[in-house]
């Protein structure tokens, strides 16, 4: 490691603490309270407290430290992570049928994320504001309004970007974790016997003593590891080593000390169960703690919102969601984006959730099903990558998968008990997103196949036009083409109706590669098909936004001079009608028509001046 890298490592690690660990770092606000609040029939006896603490600690070790940080983070696509990246990697060296199954798993995982992301800001901010019940009990009726006000401000500032505010995230979250550690250590010193719960035998004893009820209680224990997926999803922003370093040096010790500190407090004062986190603090520190808890939960919510924007952009670029307006809020960092439609839809959903559930304890009952479902899918996809891409021994990979599923499946099954008490919410939202993504992908494929059924050869058509040219007019025409060797619809209709052709014709295809970024050297490929026809293929990664002006600049460097304001862009605009279908496919077709009508039009997607665009309409039956 170079000197420069050594100097920058602390800064990157600090930044990772500020962004990556917001969700899991605010879990102590509510996790142990939900475990021991009486909903499972446990009292605050020593065996129950020690059992829950042991389960929480060893889940943090096994799921976060071993599974995600050690194993899953090995699977990266040019340094990027996330469930859709894992899906893409897993399907690279498999059969078509297996790839289809893996794609479905990846889309379900992505859909689950959309389901949980509605709950995360609500439960995080509400659990912090609920500290008012301790500071000033008479203000408890203000918890819901204040939570909505805080989140309204957060969603309103999204369009301005978080570059300036983001600089404060890291020091605030570092302070938060140090406070977690300090509060916990203070309580542990007063009752050090709680450290016996570090022994995993207490977790085993917990299951043996409480049997079926202990299994159901896993639905509350899982709250301690929500946010684990963010470590993998944010890998591209900070790198593997800083994320791992932050976990083992700051986050894990702080979480452990705080959970065990809460346990020590409950053994000494069972009445503290109403809010063991805030009651760890002395009276004089309650208001400052409430303020920094609110800030920490806002930061956790911001990380989740940014994650939704990133996942949506990736899904759009990979063709699983319809094109939508994406605004870059930073000239320096391509990952800082704002998607207005997603932002306000998420805001409305979060407000409805807060008003409907009214208390973080009620939200906790809805939290966990989608998280644990994603954990199961991550285990299957990551071990598939280990076998197919890394060529690990199949028996060793099977052993790893069994070990992961022995933890993931019980956690997921235990959370199914929450289905009627609120777990239906993330599952319903996830199901809607899965239907939307699969509908757009499959119907889009059906449309393109229908449009390319004419079967005419591009080479033959160009040869015919060069041999018997129509009237040629001065200038350059660019025809946007979705496929490389297919005649663009706009070209056929221009010749059919206008019977003219420009002196120079460029067939432009914008392609999304299976990588986050494409190097500028490989950005543009130019091929001259005839004296007056050129084919240009511009490649972009799924973290990049295509820009025709940049493509023209690259073409100029390669010897094909193009000027935006002297070029006419011909595009086809499809007017879709539904053909005869079974009722269920007709419903899917109607959903696709709705998505198509509201999709961002091509000129806006590719930043083409509207006065240079000519759209030729055509009716297509699907």
From Swiss-Prot:
GO terms for molecular function: potassium ion transmembrane transporter activity; symporter activity. It is a multi-pass membrane protein. The keyword Cell inner membrane applies. It catalyses: K(+)(in) + H(+)(in) = K(+)(out) + H(+)(out). Pfam families: K_trans (PF02705), K_trans_C (PF22776). One of its GO terms (cellular component) is plasma membrane. It is found in: Cell inner membrane. Keywords: Cell inner membrane, Cell membrane, Ion transport, Membrane, Potassium, Potassium transport, Symport, Transmembrane, Transmembrane helix, Transport. The chain crosses the membrane at residues 9-29, 49-69, 103-123, 137-157, 165-185, 213-233, 247-267, 276-296, 337-357, 363-383, 396-416, 419-439. The keyword Membrane applies. It comes from the Bacteria. Belongs to the HAK/KUP transporter (TC 2.A.72) family. Responsible for the low-affinity transport of potassium into the cell. Likely operates as a K(+):H(+) symporter. HAMAP family: Kup (MF_01522). This is Low affinity potassium transport system protein Kup.
């Amino acid at each position: 490691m170079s000197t420069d890298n050594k100097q920058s490592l602390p800064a990157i690690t600090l930044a990772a603490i500020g962004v990556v660990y917001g969700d899991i770092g605010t879990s102590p606000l509510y996790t142990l309270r939900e475990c021991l609040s009486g909903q499972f029939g446990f009292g605050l006896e020593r065996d129950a407290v020690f059992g829950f603490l042991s389960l929480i600690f060893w889940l943090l070790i096994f799921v976060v430290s071993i599974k995600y940080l050690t194993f899953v983070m090995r699977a990266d696509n040019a340094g990027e992570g996330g469930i859709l990246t894992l899906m893409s990697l897993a399907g690279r060296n498999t059969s078509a049928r297996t790839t289809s199954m893996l794609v479905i798993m990846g889309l379900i995982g992505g859909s689950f994320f959309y389901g949980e992301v509605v709950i995360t800001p609500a439960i995080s901010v509400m659990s912090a504001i609920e500290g008012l019940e301790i500071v000033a009990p008479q203000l408890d009726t203000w918890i819901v309004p204040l939570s909505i006000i805080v989140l309204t401000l957060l969603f309103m500032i999204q369009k301005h970007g978080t570059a300036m505010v983001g600089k404060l995230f890291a020091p605030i979250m570092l302070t938060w974790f140090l406070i977690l550690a300090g509060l916990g250590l203070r309580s542990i010193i007063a009752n050090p016997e709680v450290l016996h719960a570090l022994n995993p035998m207490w977790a085993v004893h917990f299951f043996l003593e409480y049997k079926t009820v202990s299994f159901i209680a896993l639905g509350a224990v899982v709250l301690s590891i929500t946010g684990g997926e963010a470590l993998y999803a944010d890998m591209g922003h900070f790198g593997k080593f800083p994320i791992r370093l932050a976990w083992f040096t700051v986050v894990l010790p702080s979480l452990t000390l705080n959970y065990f500190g809460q346990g020590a407090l409950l053994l000494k004062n069972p009445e503290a169960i109403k809010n063991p986190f805030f009651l760890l603090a002395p009276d004089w520190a309650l208001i400052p703690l409430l303020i920094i808890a609110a800030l920490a939960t806002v930061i956790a919510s911001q990380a989740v919102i940014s994650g939704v924007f990133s996942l949506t952009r990736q899904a759009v670029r990979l063709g699983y969601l319809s094109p939508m307006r994406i605004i870059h809020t930073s000239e320096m960092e391509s990952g800082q984006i704002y998607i207005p439609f997603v932002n306000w839809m998420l805001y409305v959903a979060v407000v409805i959730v807060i008003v409907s559930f009214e208390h973080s304890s009620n939200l906790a009952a809805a939290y966990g099903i989608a998280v644990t479902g994603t954990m199961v899918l991550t285990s299957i996809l990551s071990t598939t990558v280990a076998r197919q891409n890394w060529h690990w021994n199949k028996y060793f990979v099977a052993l790893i998968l069994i070990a992961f599923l022995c933890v993931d499946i019980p956690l997921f099954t235990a959370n199914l008990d929450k289905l009627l008490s609120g777990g239906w919410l993330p599952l319903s939202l996830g199901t809607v997103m899965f239907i939307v993504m699969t509908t757009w992908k499959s119907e889009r494929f059906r449309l393109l196949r229908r449009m390319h059924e004419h079967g005419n050869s591009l080479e033959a058509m160009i040869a015919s036009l060069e041999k018997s040219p129509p009237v040629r007019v001065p200038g350059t025409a660019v025809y946007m083409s979705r496929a490389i060797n297919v005649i663009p619809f706009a070209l056929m209709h221009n010749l059919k109706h206008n019977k003219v052709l420009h002196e120079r014709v460029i067939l432009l295809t914008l392609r999304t590669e299976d990588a986050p970024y494409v190097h500028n050297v490989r950005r543009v490929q130019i091929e001259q098909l005839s004296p007056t026809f050129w084919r240009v293929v511009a490649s972009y990664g799924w973290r990049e936004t295509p820009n025709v002006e940049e493509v023209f600049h690259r073409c100029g460097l390669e010897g094909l001079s193009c000027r935006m304001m002297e070029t006419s862009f011909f595009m086809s605009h499809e007017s879709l009608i539904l053909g005869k279908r079974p009722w269920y496919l007709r419903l899917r077709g109607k959903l696709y028509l709705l998505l198509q009508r509201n999709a961002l039009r091509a000129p806006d997607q590719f930043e083409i001046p509207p006065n240079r665009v000519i759209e030729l309409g055509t009716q297509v039956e699907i």
